[in-house]
Amino acid sequence: MKNTLALTLLLALISMNAMSHSQPQAQSDTVVVTTSMGTITIALFEKQAPVSTRNFLAYVDSGFYGGLIFHPVIPGFMIQGGGFLKNMTKRQPILPPIKNESDNGLNNERGTLSMARTQDPNSATSQFFVNLVDNEALDISSRGLGYAVFGKVISGMDIVDKIAQVKTGSVGPFNDVPVQPVIIISAKRK
């Protein structure tokens, strides 16, 4: 009887451990981004992307994102924010570039939030983007580091999709600029 009970408990523990690995990764801080088109709520993956999460929260806590626009906006790909005012003046980052965390096991799937960067993999600062589709080409691969996922939209994906459908054009050297700016009014921890 004791052996049966011990075996049952062991199997239950193994089963619980397996179930915990199949559950979505733990989410920590939540950020509410209020835009001129509606509200987007984002859960951040601090455990998997601690550097990107701390960086993003530092910008959020400083009020940096208020007044910035979404640009570029590319239907079927992504919407990006965190860098430009509506007159297309770049707001200079307040923190140094961060280490690329695209090797964290998270993929650029629809609704995920990732760090934008230049060709230099370790150049991400304030700009981020929301994937509109699964963008496997942005994940880490044999070609090198990808774009680090550090969060996911948990409410307001309909707003993200509406932003993706706005009419865009060119402003100076910039393409995919919304004709009617989509403004980030605020980004705050929930």
Per-segment meaning from a language model:
Residues 1-4:
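Positively charged n-region of N-terminal signal peptides that target proteins for export
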Residues 16-190:
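Cyclophilin-like peptidyl-prolyl cis-trans isomerases
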Residues 6-16:
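Bacterial N-terminal signal peptides
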